[in-house]
Swiss-Prot record:
Bridged cysteine pairs (disulfide): none
Domain of life: Eukaryota
Bias kind Polar residues: ranges: 650-662
MF terms (GO), sorted A to Z: zinc ion binding
UniProt KW keywords: LIM domain, Metal-binding, Repeat, Zinc
Domain LIM zinc-binding: 242-306, 307-367, 368-430
Chain residue ranges for the region called Disordered: 30-96, 427-487, 616-684
Family: Belongs to the prickle / espinas / testin family.
Protein name in UniProt: Protein espinas
Pfam families associated with the record: LIM, PET
Biased composition (Basic residues): 666-675
PET domain location: 135-243
PANTHER family: LIM DOMAIN-CONTAINING PROTEIN, PROTEIN ESPINAS-RELATED
């Protein structure tokens, strides 16, 4: 094929006309023949394609410029020989293509045929023979039966079809892809022409910055593709049943199908199945390229042989190229899409198939943190949800209420913010069940407390060892008070006092034979409580934030090993509200009273100490341990007013630690919750500090009687009828514990019932009238007191 020098046409228009002419040459059998186009022919066909792509009327192109005038080399006798080589006998003319030197846009249009006939009539005497054959071809064409049916409603139609066959063909295509004039289908066709048949793949003049070697290689590449792979589909009716090559469905006789000669005469496709095997788009104007039995558009067929630059959209003929993200670039074209800085060997970010340097990407596409408002750089971690973005840090990606980190944890989005739990989303403080992270807001000292409570008689050496172990256990919770704690100080004072009374040897020796040990561990001394509370509140810190809590609370619970008072303990005290003076006012008065209590104790000789327990044994004869203990308590408390110490505090909104109690405590405690919004008040009923002196009032004489009178006059003495009525049971060795509670935004009131033994005693009294009458006669007034204050209420 000879290279013809051509003038510079309008972009793309002459290129597509030339491509179609080459296809017509191939299918008409004149592959090796070339017809040099005349300048007027190029200008005419260029204007026609341009007007078709601009949605103009086809009828406006019916001018005399449609005449294809052969060049000087094709006139005379040579012209007749070349013209007759494109035609066959009239029997085969129905399925033949028009002459190759006719533009494709001039085929199958009555208006174009009329203009062609008019122009041919004035062509000159040298073209009469060719003119008669062309007129004969038009008259016998099935695409024009001179019936007056206009096909100009389409910008392109398959060649060689009657109007009804044209409509049958287009009925097999989607409506938005049928090339009606001034329709989306026409725009689709023009777009696919530019995309499927890129001119830079075939013509050097449409390429940029090609070297001489690359220009030569492009010409060879284009000629080889046209010679080996280029073809055009033929549309006609099917005569027998065949399967569709695209969808494998059966085609029956009479269906309109598309044939591709380069893939074989037996293969056919539905009109809608004649698509590119890569992009799956309809092959525009039925122009295809084949390779290995597959159909390709011009673009993707070229890419099967050479890489294409993603920047300039040209075939890469150089030996080196850049590959990234499954794409290829010329070495000099791999640059930032914004600043055009070359990115070879540098970091980059791909967005929508285009590379960007880090600076340009941050400027154009960086997100802002929803928490701190700062830019989230490409080097920083990012968390995104529903259009919101955060830095992937513990500070930014955290709960909106409690600020706990949500990295690696499920979160709850609500109203544009994120939370760690439902409680936090409602504005409530987190509970232990809602979150497992974060510091423990409420210190736990129950393990050390329960280890110091004696449930059976034991030696003072064992108590010292337990006390030492409890101090070591509490060392992790906060700083230990050391040897100057309130519990150690009072214990040494009591030991000196008992030695002066002559009882120290008795206690250290494990007890005198015949004299029983006290059945209960000693109670809490409120002077010790006052010292501990004073130490706690010295820095105006709450019980939840004070590091001295766990060191002072165990000291508060330490008891004097030599004493034999009944024992009750305080488990939970809220110290948020009261000041130092409020907390220690009542305890200071009690300390003054206790100084008076020491004198009768010092006057007790060995026989007095023995007499104290002898009276206790005589009292218990004939009754069970639990019943008689309650009656003795009631006898001492009959005519005495009830006192109590109250600790007022603000509402505790912090999460409480889990209560670690044994099964016996859990069985004798019930928990009920009542939701309210009022402020809470904690009321703690303290036990009688000198209950054994009251029990031995009849046997000890005037000293014990004076002690009881001192207790009556004490304004701060607290007597809980519940605790005193059940003080004879072994279950009272345990500390009364508040049940763990969950906060839901309001105050909870928990009612702690009596222990199981006291409850059982009440049932026995109710079932046995004789026992109830005896108890009422022995201790009048006690049942009334017990019924009135049966429960210790913590609100």
């Amino acid at each position: 094929m000879q290279q013809q020098p051509q003038p510079q046409p309008l972009p793309h228009s002459s290129y597509y006309t030339q491509t179609e002419s080459e296809l017509l040459q191939i299918e008409a059998g004149g592959t090796g023949l070339t017809f040099p186009p005349h300048r007027s022919e190029m200008a005419a066909t260029s204007s026609q394609l341009q007007q078709a792509s601009m949605s103009s009327n086809v009828a406006s192109t019916a001018t005399s410029s449609n005449l294809d005038v052969p060049s000087g080399g094709s006139t005379g006798s040579g012209s007749g020989g070349q013209t007759t080589s494109h035609f066959v006998s009239p029997l085969q003319r129905r399925h033949c293509q028009p002459p190759s030197h006719l533009p494709l846009n001039s085929v199958a249009s009555p208006l174009r045929t009329a203009s062609y006939k008019t122009a041919a009539a004035v062509a000159g005497h040298g073209f009469h023979h060719s003119h008669h054959q062309q007129l004969d071809f038009q008259r016998n064409s099935q695409s024009d039966d001179d019936s007056g049916c206009a096909l100009e409603e389409y910008t392109w139609v398959p060649p060689g079809l009657r109007p009804d066959q044209v409509r049958l063909y287009f009925s097999q295509l989607p409506d938005d892809k049928v090339p009606y004039v001034n329709s989306p289908g026409e725009k689709y066709r023009v777009k696919q022409l530019l995309h499927q048949l890129p001119p830079q793949d075939n013509e050097v003049r449409y390429c940029h910055s090609l070297s001489d070697e690359e220009r030569k290689e492009l010409r060879i590449f284009s000629a080889q593709r046209k010679r080996e792979a280029l073809g055009r589909g033929a549309v006609r009716l099917l005569s027998d049943e065949r399967p569709c090559k695209g969808c494998e469905e059966s085609l029956s006789g009479g269906d309109i199908v598309v044939f591709a000669q380069r893939l074989g005469a037996q293969l056919c496709w539905h009109p809608g199945c004649f698509v590119c095997s890569v992009c799956k788009e309809l092959l525009v104007d039925l122009i295809y390229f084949q390779r290995d039995g597959n159909l390709y558009c011009g673009r993707h067929h070229a890419e099967t042989q050479k890489p294409r630059c993603s920047a300039c959209d040209e075939i890469i003929f150089s030996d080196e190229c850049t590959e990234a993200e499954g794409r290829t670039w010329h070495m000099k074209h791999f640059a930032c899409q914004e600043c055009e800085h070359q990115l070879g060997g540098q970091r980059y970010i791909m967005r929508e198939g285009k590379p960007y340097c880090l600076g340009c990407f941050d400027t154009m596409f960086a997100e802002y943190c929803d928490y701190c408002g700062e830019v989230i750089g490409v080097d920083q971690g990012q968390m995104s949800h529903d259009g919101q973005h955060w830095h992937a840090t513990d500070q930014c990606f955290s709960c909106c209420t409690c600020r706990c980190s949500l990295l690696g944890r499920p979160f709850l989005p609500r109203r544009g913010t994120i939370y760690c739990s439902i409680a936090c989303s409602k504005g409530e403080p987190p509970t232990p069940s809602d979150t497992s992270s974060g510091p423990q807001l409420r210190p736990t000292h129950r393990a050390s407390t329960s280890s110091q409570i004696a449930r059976s008689p034991r030696r003072s050496g064992d108590r010292d060892r337990e006390r030492e172990s409890s101090r070591k256990a509490n060392h992790g919770h906060g700083p230990v008070k050391g040897t100057g704690s309130a519990g150690d100080l009072l214990e040494r004072q009591e030991r000196k006092r008992m030695e002066a009374a002559g009882v120290a040897d008795l206690l250290l020796g494990g007890g005198v034979p015949g004299m029983p040990r006290p059945a209960h561990p000693p109670p809490i001394d409120l002077t010790e409580l006052g010292i501990s509370l004073d130490n706690i509140c010295a820095g105006d810190k709450s019980i939840f934030g004070d590091s001295q809590l766990t060191s002072s609370m165990p000291d508060m619970l330490l008891s004097k090993a030599e004493d034999s008072h009944s024992y009750q303990s305080i488990d939970k005290i809220n110290l948020n509200s009261p000041s130092n003076s409020d907390l220690t006012q009542s305890t200071q008065e009690l300390a003054n009273e206790l100084e008076l209590d020491n004198d009768p104790v010092r006057e007790l000789p060995h026989d007095g100490y023995e007499q104290l327990f002898a009276n206790n044994r005589n009292t218990k004869k004939g009754h069970e341990l639990q019943d008689m203990q309650g009656e003795e308590d009631g006898e001492q408390l009959d005519n005495r007013p009830l006192k109590e110490v109250r600790f007022h505090s603000v509402q505790d909104t912090m999460s409480r630690s889990k209560s670690y109690t044994d099964n016996s405590n859990a069985r004798r405690r019930r928990r009920r919750r009542n939701q309210s919004r009022s402020s809470s008040e904690m009321q703690i009923n303290q036990t009688n500090l000198r209950l054994h002196n009251a029990q031995t009032q009849a046997g000890t004489g005037t000293g014990a009687h004076n002690l009881l009178n001192n207790l009556d006059n004490c304004d701060v003495a607290s007597i809980c009828s519940t605790c005193s009525s059940s003080s004879s049971s072994d279950m009272d060795d345990y500390v009364y514990r508040l049940p763990a509670r969950k906060h839901y935004g309001g105050v909870r009131v928990a009612y702690v019932p009596n222990d199981a033994l006291a409850y059982e005693r009440k049932k026995k009294l109710a079932q046995d009238p004789s026992l109830a009458a005896a108890a009422s006669a022995a201790v009048p007034g006690v049942p009334g007191v017990m019924n009135e204050s049966k429960n210790c209420t913590i609100s």
